[in-house]
């Protein structure tokens, strides 16, 4: 960092499998928390002035409906805890070293580049739309829904799905805001609308026929529902989404998986 005169950092590195985090806390502590601490230590006595950090809406814990940035953190799972602790490390380091931070609390990131040229290769983190896209290429697709006894309308988890291309744009705008305004911020990154797992699967079933839906027990660490209050987000960054369409998100993910296969 010092050798290359780095002035701004976008910190995305972390493990992100909610279930795995519960089973292997040491792995997640070392990579997510200690990794962040090591990065901050490397920033000491450097030219770094700004850092954008990818956090998670999971730090809010069990909420009902829309959640704003003012809500007190209440992480329920270990993955969420690692994000919360990383946020705290960044805030503390900022006070001690006079640099600005932008904390972006991601809601559920999904989809791929509309062009079909860029997407996610990792298949093991258990994200719903990624799994649906993978299954779309199979002759006999099977979808697992983890939990149908949550306190939601149809019993399945509700999430706010945000297109990855929109999220990438947020990082650029967030970094520009730090440079132009010299003010730190914490913002939700979502569209402000939630879809249940069942709703997403039902949309997918209209795209792919013959889907075998299997209901399983809840996954440890999952919360019932959460979606973003985006008022502060849009006000500060003057941001407007380009891909706020759940069908577009699903189709872009499927398009990417087809490219990987070919």
Describe the residue ranges of each PLM region.
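Short-chain dehydrogenase/reductase
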Residues: 27-29, 76-84, 118-130, 160-161, ...
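Active-site Tyr-X1-5-Lys
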Residues: 62-63, 74-112, 130-140
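Hydrophobic positions on the long internal alpha-helix
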Residues: 35-43, 90, 170, 174
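Short alpha-helix in the Rossmann-fold core of NAD(P)-dependent oxidoreductases
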Residues: 14, 24, 29-36, 52-55, ...
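C-terminal substrate-binding subdomain of Rossmann-fold SDR/epimerase-dehydratase oxidoreductases
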Residues: 131-262
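NAD(P)H-binding glycine-rich loop region in Rossmannoid oxidoreductase-like domains
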Residues: 1-31
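Conserved Rossmann-fold NAD(P)-dependent oxidoreductase catalytic core, especially the SDR/UDP-sugar
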Residues: 11, 37-78, 96, 102
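Structural signature of the Rossmann-like NAD(P)-dependent dehydrogenase/reductase core
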Residues: 11, 50-53, 102-105, 144, ...
